[in-house]
Structures are given as C-alpha cells and as structure tokens.
Regions:
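Hydrophobic micro-sites
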Residues: 1-6, 186-250
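P-loop/Walker-type NTP enzyme "switch/lid" segment
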Residues: 2-21, 25-32, 41-46, 53, ...
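Inter-motif core of Ras-like GTPase G domains
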Residues: 143, 155-178
C-alpha cells in the first residue's frame, strides 16, 4: 500500500473541534448499517472537502478505521490543499481499469486514516462513477473499514453527486451559512429524494459566530462554567468534552 504524508493539517479551534465531534457522534447514532457516507453541497466552495477531510480525521482519531474517497473527479482540490505529494494512482485509474484497489488506497501518517485520491480528470466522470467497478469499490471498502467517507461534486453543478449518493448508505448536505437560499437547498434535497438517496442531515458551514453574537456568548459562558473549575483544579478534561458534545447536540 502506498503511503503519503499529510503536511498541511489544519489547526482547529475548540468550537470547531467540538462541532466535528458532535457530527461524528451523530453519525454513530445512525446505526451500524450507515458506514458509507457521502458528502455533497449545493454549489462549489461551500467547504464540503474540508468537512469531509476533518470528519474522516475525527473518526480516525476516535479509533475508527476510516478511508476518505475523493470522488470529485472533475475538480479535486484534496491533494493540492493538504500537500500530500504525488500519489501514483487514484480513483479514476481504478474505475477505468488501469489500477487495482490496493494500488489506489494510500496509507497516511495519521493512524487509522487512509485516502483514495481522485486521480487525473477523466473524459467521462459520470459514466465511471456509475459503473460496476465503483459499486464493487464501495462494497470492498465496507468490508475493510469502519467508515467510508466520500467527497462528491456539488449537486447543483453536475449529476455525479447523486450517482455517488445512490451508492452510499446515507448523504450529508453541506450548506454555507448566508450563501445558499432555502429554495436552493430544498431543490438539492428534492434531487436526492428523486434519486432514491437517504439524506442523513445537513451541516451549516462557515458560520460567522461574531455576527451570531448571542450564540457565541452563550457558548463561551457555557464553556467556562462547565470547564472552569476543573481547569483550575488541573483535572483531566477529556470526559467533559464528550459530555459537552452530547449537550450541544441536544
């Protein structure tokens, strides 16, 4: 199995880390049958690749063997964004019969976290994602990993995301705050339903907590009241963090 080094790991603040822990926890409550999860968005640049990557990282950090599949065959940014180097094979190589699965799966320097990169842009992305090899790929990964996170193209641009979502156990829709209208989001939800996809929920991304001042102040107050005394006494905060994620979910 080839190995790549992830050189540009994002440093997340406390709120963001807790948000991913909450998302991770919510996914675990969907049940053991929901292991292949696709993530899509309405339009480009809503942050779906970052959410996919950080969610997969969070699952791996929790001890879950996780693989991130970059199925955005038209405009992938994963390798460039995280400066992983030059992998030899990717998803498009496998789907077109130019490589085997073991050639395309890359081990990373993060324990329990593997990646399948998109590979070079093919002339027929939709046809490749709709062929039997992609179905077989997900079935094989399901037998090997606890979670398979699939980053897909925006549904408002091309049909690829719906094709992948149909092969997944469930789909999460990423919505950029103050950018996507209710009508646009409903249109995407309708597309997923017509394609027979199961929508697990939505993630509101790029929220400006300074504008949402009331929530931000509440969170800071809650954080201090929950952790303040323990931090002063030097207690281990790992367990309260889990409890905080549960509380936030409510």
């Amino acid at each position: 199995m080839p190995k790549v080094m992830i050189r540009e790991l994002e440093k997340l603040d406390f709120r963001t880390k807790e948000a991913y822990k909450t998302l991770r926890t919510n996914l675990s409550f969907t049940g053991k049958d929901f292991r292949v999860i696709s993530l899509t968005s309405c339009t480009p640049n809503e942050g779906k690749t970052s959410v996919s990557f950080q969610l997969a990282m969070s699952l791996a950090e929790d001890g879950k063997k996780t693989v991130l599949v970059d199925a955005d065959l038209r405009k992938s940014v994963l390798r460039r964004r995280y400066r992983t180097g030059h992998e030899k094979y990717g998803l498009s190589h496998y789907l077109s019969g130019q490589a085997e699965l073991e050639d395309a799966v890359c081990e990373t320097n993060v324990p329990d976290f593997h990646i399948i990169f998109a590979g070079p842009v093919p002339p027929n992305p939709s046809e490749l994602l709709g062929n039997q090899r992609f179905h077989a790929l997900l079935q094989s990964l399901r037998e090997t990993y606890d979670y398979v996170i699939v980053d897909t193209p925006p549904l408002g641009s091309v049909i690829d995301g719906a094709i992948v979502a149909r092969e997944s156990d469930g789909t999460v829709l990423i919505i950029e705050s103050d950018s996507i209208s209710y009508k646009a989001a409903q249109n995407i939800v309708s597309q997923l339903e017509k394609a027979g996809c199961r929508l697990l929920g939505c993630v509101l991304n790029k929220v400006d907590l300074k504008r949402a001042g009331r929530y931000g102040k509440y969170y800071e107050k809650y954080y201090y009241s929950y952790y303040g005394s323990a931090a002063d006494e030097g207690e281990n905060l790992s367990e309260p963090e889990t409890a905080a994620a549960e509380e936030t979910k409510k």
